[in-house]
């Protein structure tokens, strides 16, 4: 169901799906050329309807979503490369996003983690710009906001809000830039190789930021949190109540580097989870009240920052939007 915004009547929309060029950072109040359009003045009233209209094509495509709140649960399994744009007054950040996709269901109610997700991405090469995604279930059970289960995914200026298991970085290579990620318990988890650059990771309750599930030594997967801000939601006292992570599987591998760690981080830094785990947990060049490593547990030494090529592999700049 679509809940219109007052500004939608001012917008103009295109009609067809095709490739569109990377935009410069600016106001995005109308559809990039060639995009299918969603909203009160668009061709489609719901995001799901626009996705259905893409059909079985394998051509590159894009969808523009006009300002408003969309009460939907969507699966993105398009066979071509799809880009989804949200209306915003500032494309360089999540802070002025005008589009929200929201749904509320827990994993036990839905039957699985994937089925609880507000947005479930299964399409290789998918990109999302300036869209807020929420699972409003709250405390009490796992309830996923985003399942990212494909290769070469990019999320730019997006916001992901949940409580337990917000962002399921499940598999493939993934890039998150200037995003907002909110939760309390294991709110970034899975076995993707994921780079989080210049993101805000915001805890709303005691718990664990990451729960990485690398299982075998030959897996090349990492979570790299680089130049990010880690803090608690204003008004919630979480002093020393949050851990950087715990290993969902035995060989979890995570680095926090070049980031600001607030006083929410417990001096121990990391916590146990999987039986017999020997995780690889690294910290490098972080600042702030939570960055003191003198009392850390489970931390491994490292001599320098991890590169994006290490995390995402060679050729990463052929699919990452390096202008963002």
UniProtKB/Swiss-Prot annotation:
Site positions for Transition state stabilizer: 164
EC class: hydrolase
This enzyme's EC code(s): 3.1.1.11
Pfam families named in the record: Pectinesterase
Cell compartments where the protein resides: Secreted
Keyword Repressor: no
Any one GO MF annotation of this record: pectinesterase activity
Glycosylation sites recorded in the entry for this protein: 27
SUPFAM superfamilies cross-referenced by the UniProt entry: Pectin lyase-like
Active site: 165 (proton donor), 186 (nucleophile)
GO biological process: one example: cell wall modification
Signal peptide per UniProt: 1-19
Annotated pathway: Glycan metabolism; pectin degradation; 2-dehydro-3-deoxy-D-gluconate from pectin: step 1/5
Keyword Cell wall biogenesis/degradation: yes
Residues binding substrate: 142, 246, 248
Alphabetical keyword list: Aspartyl esterase, Cell wall biogenesis/degradation, Glycoprotein, Hydrolase, Secreted, Signal
GO CC annotations, alphabetized: extracellular region
Catalysed reaction equations from the record: [(1->4)-alpha-D-galacturonosyl methyl ester](n) + n H2O = [(1->4)-alpha-D-galacturonosyl](n) + n methanol + n H(+)
Function: Involved in maceration and soft-rotting of plant tissue.
PANTHER family according to UniProt: ACYL-COA THIOESTER HYDROLASE YBHC-RELATED, PECTINESTERASE 53-RELATED
Membership in a protein family: Belongs to the pectinesterase family.
Protein name (database record): Probable pectinesterase A
Native organism: Aspergillus fumigatus (strain ATCC MYA-4609 / CBS 101355 / FGSC A1100 / Af293) (Neosartorya fumigata)
Origin organism lineage: Eukaryota, Fungi, Dikarya, Ascomycota, Pezizomycotina
């Amino acid at each position: 169901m679509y809940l219109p915004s007052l500004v939608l009547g001012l917008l103009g929309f295109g009609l067809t799906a095709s490739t569109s060029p990377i935009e410069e950072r600016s106001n995005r109040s109308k559809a990039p050329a060639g995009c299918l359009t969603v909203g009160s003045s668009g061709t489609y009233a719901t995001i799901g309807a626009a996705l259905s209209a893409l059909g079985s094509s394998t051509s590159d495509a894009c969808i523009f979503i006009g300002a408003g709140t969309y009460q939907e649960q969507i699966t993105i399994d398009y066979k071509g490369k799809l880009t989804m744009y949200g209306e915003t007054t500032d494309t360089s950040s999540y802070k002025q996003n005008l589009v929200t996709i929201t749904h509320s269901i827990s994993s036990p109610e839905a039957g699985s983690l994937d089925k609880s997700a507000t947005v479930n991405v299964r399409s290789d090469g998918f990109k999302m710009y300036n869209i807020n995604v929420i699972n409003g279930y709250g405390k009490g059970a796992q309830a996923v906001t985003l399942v990212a289960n494909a290769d070469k995914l990019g999320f730019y200026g997006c916001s992901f809000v949940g409580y337990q298991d917000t962002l399921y970085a499940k598999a493939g290579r993934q890039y998150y830039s200037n995003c907002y990620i909110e939760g309390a318990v294991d709110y970034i988890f899975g076995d993707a190789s994921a780079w989080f650059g210049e993101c805000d990771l915001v805890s709303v309750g005691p718990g664990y930021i990451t729960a990485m599930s690398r299982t075998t030594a030959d897996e090349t997967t990492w979570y790299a949190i680089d130049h990010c801000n880690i803090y608690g939601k204003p008004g919630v006292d979480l002093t020393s109540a949050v851990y950087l992570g715990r290993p969902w599987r035995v060989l979890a591998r995570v680095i926090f580097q070049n980031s600001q760690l607030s006083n929410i981080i417990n001096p121990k830094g990391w916590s146990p989870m999987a039986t017999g785990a020997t995780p690889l947990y690294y910290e490098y060049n972080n600042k702030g009240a939570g960055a003191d490593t003198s009392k850390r547990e489970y931390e491994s030494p490292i001599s320098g920052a991890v590169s994006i090529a290490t995390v995402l592999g060679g050729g990463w700049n052929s699919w990452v939007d390096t202008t963002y």
